[in-house]
């Protein structure tokens, strides 16, 4: 009769290595997708508007406005690729950039100046 616990250490090592590797891969993919959503249009597309991927980048989607047809979404329709104000009420940057990191209950996050 063979011992059922003979290879338990080796099996546990394989399972834990596979678990750690899968966690690393999933976290890398999720972080890349999250960062890709908040690329400003001037840096991400260099001013080019593509109809088929308009809703792929959430930073360029404006709720309540139709899909742009002429490629210029700035008020003055300037051709430079700098971040400009969209209107006098809306700033040029993203609010996600200025948000503080961490949660309100994290004591270590409060001490950092980010």
Curated annotation (Swiss-Prot):
Residues annotated as transmembrane: 13-30
Gene Ontology annotations of biological process type: mitochondrial cytochrome c oxidase assembly; mitochondrial respirasome assembly; mitochondrial respiratory chain complex III assembly
Signal peptide extent: none
Subcellular location, record wording: Mitochondrion outer membrane
Topological category with respect to the lipid bilayer: Single-pass membrane protein
GO cellular component: mitochondrial inner membrane; mitochondrial outer membrane; mitochondrion
Keywords of this entry: Membrane, Mitochondrion, Mitochondrion outer membrane, Transmembrane, Transmembrane helix
Protein name per the record: Uncharacterized mitochondrial outer membrane protein YDR381C-A
Organism: Saccharomyces cerevisiae (strain ATCC 204508 / S288c) (Baker's yeast)
């Amino acid at each position: 009769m063979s011992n059922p616990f003979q290879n338990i250490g080796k099996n546990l090592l394989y399972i834990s290595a596979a678990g750690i590797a899968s966690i690393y891969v999933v976290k890398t993919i999720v972080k890349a997708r999250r960062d890709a959503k908040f690329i400003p249009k001037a840096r991400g597309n260099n001013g080019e508007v593509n109809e088929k991927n308009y809703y792929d980048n959430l930073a360029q989607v404006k709720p309540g406005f139709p899909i742009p047809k002429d490629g210029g979404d700035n008020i003055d329709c300037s051709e430079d690729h700098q971040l400009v104000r969209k209107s006098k009420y809306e700033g040029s940057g993203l609010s996600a950039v200025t948000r503080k990191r961490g949660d309100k209950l994290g004591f270590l996050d409060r001490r950092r100046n980010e």
